Amino acid sequence: MERKSQVSDTNNNSIPTNVLLKFVGFSVALFTLPLITYFWTLKTLFKGYQTLYAGLSAAVMVNIILALYIVAAFREDSGTPKKDIKRE
């Protein structure tokens, strides 16, 4: 009976909560912020070539969010301890 609990603990492949929250947060940002940027710049900033510049600003926003996600992913701790290998 004890052995089953030990096996289930080692086979626990659940995703940490902070990783899921980060993923959901960036997913929501990736969906909403470019739309908000597009419509805000369309109505307030650009005159003349409104849709072109508003679309470009939304595309820039997507690239910013993706870059931030990549930086956050690289900075995240993998959770595996690093072993020091000493050669003698």
Swiss-Prot record:
It is a multi-pass membrane protein. It holds the Pfam family VMA21. Residues 40-53 are lumenal. The gene is vma21. GO terms for biological process: vacuolar proton-transporting V-type ATPase complex assembly. Residues 1-18, 75-88 are cytoplasmic. This is Vacuolar ATPase assembly integral membrane protein vma21. Belongs to the VMA21 family. It comes from Schizosaccharomyces pombe (strain 972 / ATCC 24843) (Fission yeast). The chain crosses the membrane at residues 19-39, 54-74. GO terms for cellular component: endoplasmic reticulum membrane; endoplasmic reticulum-Golgi intermediate compartment membrane; ER to Golgi transport vesicle membrane. Coiled coil: none annotated. Keywords: Cytoplasmic vesicle, Endoplasmic reticulum, Membrane, Transmembrane, Transmembrane helix. Required for the assembly of the V0 complex of the vacuolar ATPase (V-ATPase) in the endoplasmic reticulum. InterPro entries: Vma21 (IPR019013). It is found in: Endoplasmic reticulum membrane; Endoplasmic reticulum-Golgi intermediate compartment membrane; Cytoplasmic vesicle, COPII-coated vesicle membrane.
